[in-house]
Amino acid sequence: MLNDGSEDIEEEIKEEVNLTLFRRWADLYLASHPLVNADMTHMVRQLEATQQGLPVEFYFFLREKEWKTWENQKDEILERLYAAVEDFGLSIYQLGIRN
């Protein structure tokens, strides 16, 4: 519980929130993945929250240059990231299509 400000907030918050843990895990996953180009930028970041939720962006480059192989490798990495969401007590929201 937060107090009247007499103590440093950083010392009061002992537990990391699940979204922070997921972002850190995902960043480490990308950094250590053998298909990800470690010489280029990679990041996991939150975008601006909307009424539909809080978007999380995965930004990374692969070593692979051939398009079909690149698409398959990218999909495998993203599928693993999506599958891990529930392990952190989070969920993916998809806005339904209206006719």
Identify the residue ranges that each predicted region occupies:
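Structured, soluble regulatory/oligomerization domains located on the cytosolic or IMS-facing side
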Residues: 1-99
